[in-house]
Regions:
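Chitinase-like catalytic core of GlcNAc-active glycosidases
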Residues: 164-209, 219-235, 239-244, 248-249, ...
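Extended amphipathic alpha-helical segments with heptad-repeat/coiled-coil character used for oligomerization
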Residues: 249-263, 317-319
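Aromatic-lined carbohydrate-recognition surfaces of secreted/lumenal glycan-active proteins
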Residues: 217-222, 281-299
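Loop/turn elements at helix/coil->beta-strand transitions in domains of secreted/extracellular proteins
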Residues: 166-167, 205-210, 236-239, 284-289, ...
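Sec-dependent signal peptide recognition
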Residues: 2-10
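Active-site-proximal loop/turn and secondary-structure-junction residues that shape catalytic pockets
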Residues: 131-133, 175-177, 217-219, 244-248, ...
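Alpha/beta catalytic barrel-like cores
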Residues: 19-191, 304, 308-314, 325-378
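C-terminal motif of bacterial Sec signal peptides marking the signal peptidase cleavage site
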Residues: 15-17
Length: 378
Protein backbone atom coordinates (compact mmCIF):
# COMPACT_ATOMS: atom_id res chain seq x y z
CA UNK A 1 0.00 0.00 0.00
CA UNK A 2 1.24 3.54 -0.65
CA UNK A 3 3.23 5.29 2.06
CA UNK A 4 4.71 8.71 2.66
CA UNK A 5 8.07 8.13 1.04
CA UNK A 6 9.84 11.26 2.29
CA UNK A 7 9.08 10.60 5.96
CA UNK A 8 10.04 6.95 5.66
CA UNK A 9 13.23 7.84 3.83
CA UNK A 10 14.42 10.10 6.63
CA UNK A 11 13.71 7.50 9.30
CA UNK A 12 15.39 4.75 7.31
CA UNK A 13 18.54 6.73 6.66
CA UNK A 14 18.86 7.74 10.31
CA UNK A 15 18.51 4.07 11.21
CA UNK A 16 21.01 3.07 8.56
CA UNK A 17 23.55 5.59 9.83
CA UNK A 18 23.48 3.94 13.27
CA UNK A 19 23.07 0.31 12.22
CA UNK A 20 25.39 -2.50 11.24
CA UNK A 21 26.99 -2.78 7.81
CA UNK A 22 24.80 -4.28 5.12
CA UNK A 23 24.89 -8.04 4.79
CA UNK A 24 26.04 -9.84 1.67
CA UNK A 25 23.13 -11.02 -0.50
CA UNK A 26 21.90 -14.58 -0.42
CA UNK A 27 22.60 -16.73 -3.44
CA UNK A 28 19.26 -18.48 -4.02
CA UNK A 29 17.77 -17.86 -7.45
CA UNK A 30 14.97 -19.04 -9.65
CA UNK A 31 15.16 -19.02 -13.46
CA UNK A 32 13.16 -16.88 -15.86
CA UNK A 33 12.87 -17.37 -19.60
CA UNK A 34 12.35 -14.13 -21.50
CA UNK A 35 12.54 -15.68 -24.98
CA UNK A 36 13.42 -18.96 -26.67
CA UNK A 37 17.00 -17.88 -26.14
CA UNK A 38 17.57 -15.74 -23.05
CA UNK A 39 16.95 -16.55 -19.41
CA UNK A 40 17.93 -14.98 -16.14
CA UNK A 41 17.58 -15.28 -12.36
CA UNK A 42 14.85 -13.53 -10.42
CA UNK A 43 15.41 -13.81 -6.64
CA UNK A 44 12.42 -13.84 -4.34
CA UNK A 45 12.08 -11.23 -1.63
CA UNK A 46 13.39 -13.63 0.98
CA UNK A 47 16.51 -14.43 -1.01
CA UNK A 48 17.85 -10.90 -1.43
CA UNK A 49 16.58 -8.42 1.13
CA UNK A 50 16.44 -4.70 0.58
CA UNK A 51 19.40 -4.33 2.93
CA UNK A 52 21.24 -7.26 1.33
CA UNK A 53 23.87 -5.20 -0.47
CA UNK A 54 27.61 -5.61 -0.84
CA UNK A 55 29.89 -2.75 0.05
CA UNK A 56 32.07 -1.59 -2.82
CA UNK A 57 35.37 -3.48 -2.90
CA UNK A 58 38.31 -1.24 -2.08
CA UNK A 59 39.79 -1.96 -5.50
CA UNK A 60 36.67 -0.71 -7.25
CA UNK A 61 36.88 2.78 -5.81
CA UNK A 62 40.58 3.20 -5.17
CA UNK A 63 41.96 6.16 -7.01
CA UNK A 64 38.74 6.81 -8.95
CA UNK A 65 36.54 8.84 -6.67
CA UNK A 66 36.16 11.57 -4.11
CA UNK A 67 35.24 11.85 -0.43
CA UNK A 68 31.67 10.65 0.19
CA UNK A 69 29.07 13.19 1.30
CA UNK A 70 28.14 13.53 4.98
CA UNK A 71 24.88 12.02 6.23
CA UNK A 72 23.33 15.48 6.27
CA UNK A 73 23.76 15.73 2.50
CA UNK A 74 22.17 12.32 2.08
CA UNK A 75 19.20 13.36 4.19
CA UNK A 76 18.68 16.53 2.19
CA UNK A 77 18.69 14.64 -1.11
CA UNK A 78 16.42 11.88 0.16
CA UNK A 79 13.86 14.33 1.52
CA UNK A 80 13.30 15.70 -1.97
CA UNK A 81 12.60 12.33 -3.60
CA UNK A 82 9.13 11.24 -4.78
CA UNK A 83 6.68 9.01 -2.95
CA UNK A 84 6.90 5.34 -3.85
CA UNK A 85 4.39 2.54 -3.82
CA UNK A 86 5.21 0.07 -1.04
CA UNK A 87 7.33 -0.09 2.07
CA UNK A 88 9.58 -2.70 0.46
CA UNK A 89 10.18 -0.47 -2.56
CA UNK A 90 10.98 2.50 -0.34
CA UNK A 91 13.40 0.56 1.85
CA UNK A 92 15.26 -0.70 -1.22
CA UNK A 93 15.38 2.70 -2.90
CA UNK A 94 16.72 4.37 0.24
CA UNK A 95 19.36 1.67 0.62
CA UNK A 96 20.34 1.98 -3.04
CA UNK A 97 20.62 5.77 -2.86
CA UNK A 98 22.71 5.48 0.30
CA UNK A 99 25.03 2.99 -1.38
CA UNK A 100 25.68 5.37 -4.25
CA UNK A 101 26.05 8.51 -2.18
CA UNK A 102 28.39 6.97 0.38
CA UNK A 103 30.63 5.19 -2.09
CA UNK A 104 33.85 7.21 -2.40
CA UNK A 105 34.20 5.97 -5.98
CA UNK A 106 31.45 8.34 -7.14
CA UNK A 107 31.73 10.48 -9.09
CA UNK A 108 34.36 8.61 -11.06
CA UNK A 109 37.42 10.66 -11.95
CA UNK A 110 37.18 10.28 -15.70
CA UNK A 111 39.75 11.47 -18.23
CA UNK A 112 39.19 14.95 -19.60
CA UNK A 113 36.22 14.91 -21.94
CA UNK A 114 36.91 15.13 -25.65
CA UNK A 115 34.84 17.29 -28.01
CA UNK A 116 31.64 15.51 -28.96
CA UNK A 117 31.48 13.39 -25.79
CA UNK A 118 27.86 12.39 -25.26
CA UNK A 119 28.02 11.76 -21.51
CA UNK A 120 27.29 13.30 -19.08
CA UNK A 121 25.99 16.23 -21.13
CA UNK A 122 23.12 14.08 -22.42
CA UNK A 123 21.10 11.13 -21.17
CA UNK A 124 20.61 8.30 -23.67
CA UNK A 125 17.09 6.82 -23.83
CA UNK A 126 16.91 3.65 -25.92
CA UNK A 127 14.42 1.11 -27.25
CA UNK A 128 15.98 -2.38 -27.32
CA UNK A 129 15.43 -5.62 -29.18
CA UNK A 130 15.48 -7.14 -32.64
CA UNK A 131 12.79 -6.59 -35.32
CA UNK A 132 12.76 -10.33 -36.09
CA UNK A 133 11.48 -11.26 -32.62
CA UNK A 134 8.42 -9.99 -30.77
CA UNK A 135 9.70 -11.50 -27.52
CA UNK A 136 13.14 -9.91 -27.30
CA UNK A 137 12.09 -6.32 -26.81
CA UNK A 138 10.00 -3.39 -27.92
CA UNK A 139 12.08 -2.97 -31.09
CA UNK A 140 10.37 -6.02 -32.58
CA UNK A 141 7.15 -6.21 -30.59
CA UNK A 142 5.25 -3.56 -32.55
CA UNK A 143 5.09 -2.60 -36.23
CA UNK A 144 7.77 0.03 -36.96
CA UNK A 145 5.40 3.00 -37.13
CA UNK A 146 3.76 2.13 -33.82
CA UNK A 147 7.09 1.37 -32.18
CA UNK A 148 8.58 4.69 -33.28
CA UNK A 149 5.46 6.54 -32.13
CA UNK A 150 5.79 4.99 -28.67
CA UNK A 151 9.49 5.80 -28.77
CA UNK A 152 8.69 9.49 -29.30
CA UNK A 153 6.33 9.41 -26.33
CA UNK A 154 8.86 7.83 -23.97
CA UNK A 155 11.62 10.23 -25.04
CA UNK A 156 9.25 13.13 -24.34
CA UNK A 157 8.61 11.78 -20.83
CA UNK A 158 12.32 11.85 -20.05
CA UNK A 159 12.74 15.33 -21.44
CA UNK A 160 9.95 16.50 -19.16
CA UNK A 161 11.27 14.64 -16.11
CA UNK A 162 14.75 16.19 -16.30
CA UNK A 163 14.75 19.35 -18.45
CA UNK A 164 18.31 20.14 -17.35
CA UNK A 165 19.71 17.08 -19.18
CA UNK A 166 19.04 16.81 -22.93
CA UNK A 167 17.88 13.40 -24.13
CA UNK A 168 19.76 11.53 -26.84
CA UNK A 169 17.34 8.98 -28.38
CA UNK A 170 18.77 5.58 -29.35
CA UNK A 171 17.72 2.30 -30.95
CA UNK A 172 19.60 -0.60 -29.39
CA UNK A 173 19.71 -3.55 -31.79
CA UNK A 174 20.84 -7.07 -30.88
CA UNK A 175 23.01 -8.06 -33.85
CA UNK A 176 24.49 -11.31 -32.48
CA UNK A 177 21.61 -13.20 -30.85
CA UNK A 178 22.42 -16.05 -28.45
CA UNK A 179 20.69 -19.35 -29.27
CA UNK A 180 19.91 -22.63 -27.51
CA UNK A 181 20.96 -24.55 -30.64
CA UNK A 182 24.58 -24.67 -31.87
CA UNK A 183 23.99 -23.55 -35.45
CA UNK A 184 26.23 -24.55 -38.36
CA UNK A 185 29.41 -23.32 -36.70
CA UNK A 186 28.58 -24.52 -33.19
CA UNK A 187 28.76 -21.03 -31.69
CA UNK A 188 25.21 -20.89 -30.29
CA UNK A 189 24.49 -17.46 -31.73
CA UNK A 190 22.81 -16.08 -34.83
CA UNK A 191 24.19 -13.06 -36.63
CA UNK A 192 21.84 -10.46 -38.05
CA UNK A 193 22.05 -9.69 -41.74
CA UNK A 194 23.71 -6.34 -42.60
CA UNK A 195 20.48 -5.37 -44.35
CA UNK A 196 18.60 -5.56 -41.04
CA UNK A 197 21.22 -3.37 -39.38
CA UNK A 198 20.84 -0.80 -42.15
CA UNK A 199 17.06 -0.85 -41.74
CA UNK A 200 17.21 -0.12 -38.01
CA UNK A 201 19.93 2.45 -38.61
CA UNK A 202 17.54 4.18 -41.01
CA UNK A 203 14.78 4.19 -38.39
CA UNK A 204 17.19 5.75 -35.91
CA UNK A 205 18.31 8.43 -38.34
CA UNK A 206 14.69 9.37 -39.01
CA UNK A 207 14.30 10.18 -35.30
CA UNK A 208 17.63 11.89 -34.74
CA UNK A 209 18.69 8.82 -32.76
CA UNK A 210 21.95 6.97 -32.44
CA UNK A 211 22.20 3.21 -33.08
CA UNK A 212 23.72 0.78 -30.59
CA UNK A 213 24.76 -2.67 -31.83
CA UNK A 214 24.58 -5.36 -29.14
CA UNK A 215 26.55 -8.61 -29.03
CA UNK A 216 25.25 -11.80 -27.38
CA UNK A 217 28.21 -13.94 -28.34
CA UNK A 218 27.16 -17.35 -27.01
CA UNK A 219 30.20 -19.61 -27.40
CA UNK A 220 31.79 -17.23 -29.86
CA UNK A 221 34.07 -14.45 -28.62
CA UNK A 222 34.07 -10.67 -28.68
CA UNK A 223 37.14 -10.65 -30.91
CA UNK A 224 35.25 -12.85 -33.40
CA UNK A 225 31.96 -10.92 -33.36
CA UNK A 226 33.15 -7.31 -33.23
CA UNK A 227 35.26 -7.10 -36.42
CA UNK A 228 32.27 -7.68 -38.71
CA UNK A 229 30.63 -4.61 -37.16
CA UNK A 230 33.54 -2.28 -37.94
CA UNK A 231 31.91 -0.83 -41.10
CA UNK A 232 28.96 0.27 -38.95
CA UNK A 233 30.97 1.31 -35.91
CA UNK A 234 33.08 3.53 -38.16
CA UNK A 235 30.06 5.81 -38.43
CA UNK A 236 29.84 8.66 -35.91
CA UNK A 237 26.34 7.73 -34.70
CA UNK A 238 26.80 3.98 -34.14
CA UNK A 239 27.89 2.59 -30.77
CA UNK A 240 28.39 -0.82 -29.10
CA UNK A 241 26.77 -3.01 -26.45
CA UNK A 242 28.08 -6.20 -24.80
CA UNK A 243 25.91 -8.75 -23.00
CA UNK A 244 27.86 -10.91 -20.53
CA UNK A 245 24.71 -12.93 -19.75
CA UNK A 246 25.24 -14.88 -22.96
CA UNK A 247 29.05 -15.04 -22.99
CA UNK A 248 29.81 -18.68 -22.25
CA UNK A 249 33.42 -18.35 -21.15
CA UNK A 250 35.24 -17.86 -17.82
CA UNK A 251 34.19 -21.20 -16.29
CA UNK A 252 31.00 -21.33 -18.39
CA UNK A 253 32.56 -23.43 -21.13
CA UNK A 254 30.42 -26.40 -22.07
CA UNK A 255 27.21 -24.72 -20.98
CA UNK A 256 24.47 -23.69 -23.41
CA UNK A 257 23.38 -20.03 -23.41
CA UNK A 258 20.33 -19.43 -21.20
CA UNK A 259 21.03 -22.51 -19.06
CA UNK A 260 23.61 -20.63 -16.99
CA UNK A 261 24.33 -16.93 -16.66
CA UNK A 262 27.45 -16.10 -18.62
CA UNK A 263 30.30 -13.81 -17.67
CA UNK A 264 32.81 -11.37 -19.10
CA UNK A 265 36.13 -10.30 -17.69
CA UNK A 266 37.54 -6.80 -17.74
CA UNK A 267 39.91 -8.06 -20.43
CA UNK A 268 36.98 -8.69 -22.77
CA UNK A 269 35.61 -5.22 -22.17
CA UNK A 270 39.05 -3.66 -22.56
CA UNK A 271 39.45 -5.37 -25.93
CA UNK A 272 36.25 -3.70 -27.12
CA UNK A 273 37.40 -0.37 -25.70
CA UNK A 274 40.68 -0.63 -27.61
CA UNK A 275 38.89 -1.41 -30.87
CA UNK A 276 36.45 1.47 -30.49
CA UNK A 277 39.18 3.88 -29.44
CA UNK A 278 41.19 2.98 -32.53
CA UNK A 279 38.20 3.78 -34.74
CA UNK A 280 37.73 7.15 -33.04
CA UNK A 281 41.36 8.02 -33.72
CA UNK A 282 41.49 6.65 -37.26
CA UNK A 283 38.30 8.29 -38.52
CA UNK A 284 38.33 11.40 -36.31
CA UNK A 285 35.03 10.40 -34.71
CA UNK A 286 33.37 11.72 -31.57
CA UNK A 287 33.88 9.41 -28.58
CA UNK A 288 32.04 6.10 -28.66
CA UNK A 289 29.67 4.81 -25.99
CA UNK A 290 30.05 1.20 -24.80
CA UNK A 291 27.12 -0.37 -22.93
CA UNK A 292 27.88 -3.42 -20.75
CA UNK A 293 24.87 -5.21 -19.23
CA UNK A 294 24.98 -6.49 -15.66
CA UNK A 295 22.47 -7.84 -13.14
CA UNK A 296 24.76 -10.07 -11.03
CA UNK A 297 28.21 -9.27 -9.71
CA UNK A 298 29.72 -12.39 -11.31
CA UNK A 299 28.57 -11.39 -14.79
CA UNK A 300 31.33 -8.79 -14.95
CA UNK A 301 34.57 -9.93 -13.37
CA UNK A 302 37.37 -7.59 -12.24
CA UNK A 303 35.23 -4.56 -13.06
CA UNK A 304 37.71 -2.25 -11.34
CA UNK A 305 40.25 -3.15 -14.05
CA UNK A 306 38.14 -1.78 -16.90
CA UNK A 307 40.25 0.94 -18.45
CA UNK A 308 39.18 4.56 -18.74
CA UNK A 309 39.82 6.05 -22.17
CA UNK A 310 38.41 9.45 -23.18
CA UNK A 311 37.63 8.03 -26.62
CA UNK A 312 35.18 5.46 -25.19
CA UNK A 313 32.59 6.20 -22.52
CA UNK A 314 31.63 3.05 -20.59
CA UNK A 315 28.16 2.48 -19.15
CA UNK A 316 27.41 -0.43 -16.81
CA UNK A 317 23.72 -1.06 -17.39
CA UNK A 318 21.47 -2.64 -14.73
CA UNK A 319 19.29 -4.97 -16.78
CA UNK A 320 17.56 -7.08 -14.13
CA UNK A 321 13.78 -7.35 -14.30
CA UNK A 322 11.19 -7.57 -11.57
CA UNK A 323 9.45 -5.53 -8.90
CA UNK A 324 10.85 -2.10 -8.00
CA UNK A 325 12.56 -3.29 -4.80
CA UNK A 326 14.46 -5.96 -6.72
CA UNK A 327 15.60 -3.53 -9.41
CA UNK A 328 16.78 -1.02 -6.79
CA UNK A 329 18.66 -3.74 -4.89
CA UNK A 330 20.31 -4.94 -8.09
CA UNK A 331 21.32 -1.42 -9.09
CA UNK A 332 22.92 -0.88 -5.69
CA UNK A 333 24.79 -4.18 -5.74
CA UNK A 334 25.93 -4.28 -9.37
CA UNK A 335 26.26 -0.65 -10.41
CA UNK A 336 26.41 1.76 -7.45
CA UNK A 337 28.69 -0.49 -5.37
CA UNK A 338 31.32 -0.91 -8.12
CA UNK A 339 32.03 2.36 -9.92
CA UNK A 340 33.37 2.03 -13.45
CA UNK A 341 32.41 5.24 -15.29
CA UNK A 342 28.66 5.75 -15.92
CA UNK A 343 25.57 3.73 -15.06
CA UNK A 344 22.44 2.66 -16.90
CA UNK A 345 19.03 1.31 -15.92
CA UNK A 346 16.80 -1.05 -17.88
CA UNK A 347 13.00 -1.04 -17.81
CA UNK A 348 10.83 -3.91 -19.07
CA UNK A 349 7.38 -3.08 -20.37
CA UNK A 350 6.12 -6.59 -19.50
CA UNK A 351 8.45 -8.39 -17.09
CA UNK A 352 8.58 -5.48 -14.63
CA UNK A 353 4.77 -5.41 -14.44
CA UNK A 354 4.02 -9.13 -14.09
CA UNK A 355 2.89 -8.75 -10.47
CA UNK A 356 0.81 -5.66 -11.05
CA UNK A 357 3.44 -3.00 -10.44
CA UNK A 358 3.34 -0.10 -12.89
CA UNK A 359 6.60 0.35 -14.75
CA UNK A 360 8.96 2.74 -12.95
CA UNK A 361 8.52 6.32 -14.07
CA UNK A 362 11.41 8.55 -15.16
CA UNK A 363 11.09 10.51 -11.93
CA UNK A 364 11.42 7.34 -9.85
CA UNK A 365 14.51 6.20 -11.75
CA UNK A 366 16.05 9.66 -11.41
CA UNK A 367 15.92 9.25 -7.62
CA UNK A 368 18.81 6.77 -7.84
CA UNK A 369 22.39 7.74 -7.08
CA UNK A 370 24.40 7.93 -9.17
CA UNK A 371 21.74 9.01 -11.62
CA UNK A 372 21.68 6.64 -14.61
CA UNK A 373 22.83 8.28 -17.82
CA UNK A 374 21.57 5.47 -20.06
CA UNK A 375 17.95 4.28 -19.95
CA UNK A 376 16.91 1.18 -21.87
CA UNK A 377 13.40 -0.11 -22.54
CA UNK A 378 12.78 -3.74 -23.50
Amino acid sequence: MPINWSTSALLLVFAGACGKPDAAPATGQRPEVRDSTPSRPQPTRGETGARGLKRAPDSAAKGRGVKPPPDSAILIQLATQPKLRTKADSISLVSSIRTGLRNPGWPVKTPSLLPGSMLPAKRIVAFYGNPLSKKMGILGELPPDQMLGKFDSVVAQWRSADPSTPVQPALHLIVSVAQRLPGKDGMYRQRSDPGLIEKVYGWARSKGAITILDIQAGKSTIDSELPRLIPFLSRPDVHLGLDPEFYMHHNREGRIPATKIGAMDARDVNYAIDQLAALVTKYHLPPKVLIVHRFTTNMLQHASEIKLDPRVQVVINMDGWGQPWYKFDTYARCEAAEPVEYTGFKLFFHNDTRKGDPILSPREVLALRPRPMYIQYQ
